[in-house]
């Protein structure tokens, strides 16, 4: 998931607005992959290099992750999507880790698309 910040800059938006638009695109991709019965989808969400971004942007990205998990949990259930996270989550703040764990737990018995989020990879 690269280029959201550059896209926003080209359009005259803030970087976080670009990331929010990226969430909308990801939602469409996940829906399509589920619809055509793709079994695994891995989204490279937040790399180790992303920790070098300005603190304000990192906080915005983590808040966007939490909001997206909250907003999409019913859709994940409805569409039988199982959430999995790969990466080193030790750097993620405890609140965000808890929300990730809750979403994983909620979808653990789903057996459709397996959605892997690579975070801090």
Language-model regions: role of each:
Residues 2-121:
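Flexible, compositionally biased loop and terminal segments
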């Amino acid at each position: 998931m690269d280029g959201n910040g550059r896209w926003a800059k080209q359009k005259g938006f803030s970087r976080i607005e670009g990331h929010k638009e990226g969430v909308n695109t990801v939602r469409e991709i996940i829906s399509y992959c589920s619809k055509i019965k793709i079994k695994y989808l891995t989204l490279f969400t937040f790399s180790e290099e992303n920790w070098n971004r300005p603190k304000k942007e990192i906080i915005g990205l983590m808040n966007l992750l939490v909001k997206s998990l909250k907003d999409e949990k019913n859709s994940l259930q409805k569409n039988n999507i199982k959430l999995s996270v790969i990466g080193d989550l030790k750097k993620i703040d405890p609140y965000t880790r808890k929300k990730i764990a809750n979403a994983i737990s909620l979808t653990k018995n789903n057996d459709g698309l397996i959605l892997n989020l690579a975070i801090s990879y």
